[in-house]
């Protein structure tokens, strides 16, 4: 499949900006969907490309939210939908997690059917490992997750829990389920590719002028391994989700999902493998000497994970999409250096 005109949602985000960069570098024409003109202006500053235009969609859950954005001459060949919340912060109601993910996904698929059914041949959706399996737990001893797995989290769990992790897992699971159900029921002319990454780390491609503007995963790295409040004696933080992927590899998977005909109607797990807090700390301390005095030391060289910690099978992504993964040392050393630069720029 060779696509030339692409609609990309969430283009101003951590993952979306890398996808946008790789699409433009591959000579795609892209319409970026963002929530406000100010966000469009920021993205334009980062990507002054004549192959980029914008659509403003303030509320991706509103009926017909994407209809105007999907009108294009030349028409769109493909759509990449990345817009969804990843905010582990207090919300007044768990619908704040669920609605943008589920309704945003169904709205864009329905919009394609209404407005661009004759031209769109492929839709790529960014889901999450959260829709597949455990989230920072080791209770699935020796489990090797595959794209056939689904998290057991129910909708009732999500609406009644006080655990934001459960609400987030549900938002990803039911948004993705809605997409597959739509394809099965409506039988559209387009096919569907879903990408399921775990924790996403790596250098930023979009403008971030303050530490407080970091996405959640990179903010975690800053707070636990880079922030000046830490010392070598600071206790090594819990591992959290121990599967990860470099943001650039995830973005490349989105690009390949457009380019490879055989990827259609497939779900791809994407992870470079396991990583522990100890391994991240070891890399930061070794590769960024100026941070040695403020990165927890722990037990250098230790794996920092149980031998039975779960893993995932990424062979389909490697075979079908041709994905190779960035070395762990490169991912975390480049990120740590960039975080120190942001910190210095804001005078912290």
What are these regions, as identified by a protein language model?
Residues 217-221, 234-256:
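Substrate-positioning beta->alpha
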């Amino acid at each position: 499949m060779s696509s030339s005109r692409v609609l990309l949602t969430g283009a101003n985000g951590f993952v979306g900006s890398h996808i946008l960069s790789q699409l433009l570098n591959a000579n795609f024409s892209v319409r970026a969907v963002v929530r406000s003109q100010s966000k469009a202006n920021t993205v334009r500053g980062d990507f002054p490309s004549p192959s980029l235009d914008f659509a403003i969609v303030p509320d991706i859950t509103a009926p017909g939210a994407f209809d105007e954005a999907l009108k294009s001459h030349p028409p769109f060949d493909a759509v990449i939908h990345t817009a969804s919340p990843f905010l582990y912060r207090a919300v007044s109601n768990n619908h704040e997690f669920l609605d943008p993910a589920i309704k945003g996904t169904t709205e864009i698929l329905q919009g394609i059917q209404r407005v661009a059914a004759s031209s769109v041949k492929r839709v790529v959706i960014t889901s999450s490992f959260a829709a597949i399996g455990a989230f920072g737990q080791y209770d699935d001893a020796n489990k090797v997750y595959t794209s056939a797995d689904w998290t057991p989290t129910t909708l009732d769990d999500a609406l009644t829990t006080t655990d934001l992790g459960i609400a987030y897992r549900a938002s990803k699971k039911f948004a993705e389920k809605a997409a597959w159900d739509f394809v099965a029921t409506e039988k559209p002319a387009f096919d569907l590719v879903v990408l399921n990454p775990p924790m996403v780390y790596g250098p930023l491609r979009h403008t971030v002028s303050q530490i407080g503007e970091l996405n959640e995963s990179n903010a975690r790295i800053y707070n636990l391994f880079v922030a000046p409040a830490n010392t070598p004696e600071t206790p090594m933080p819990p591992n959290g989700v121990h599967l990860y992927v470099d943001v650039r590899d995830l973005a490349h998977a989105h690009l390949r999902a457009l380019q490879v005909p055989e990827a259609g109607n497939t779900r791809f797990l994407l992870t470079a493998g396991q990583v522990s807090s100890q391994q991240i700390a070891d890399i930061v301390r070794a590769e960024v000497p100026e941070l040695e005095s403020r990165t927890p030391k722990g037990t250098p060289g230790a794996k920092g994970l149980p031998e039975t910690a779960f893993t995932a099978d990424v062979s389909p992504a490697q075979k079908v999409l041709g994905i190779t993964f960035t070395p762990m040392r490169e991912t975390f050393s480049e990120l740590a250096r960039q975080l120190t630069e942001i910190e210095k720029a804001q005078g912290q």
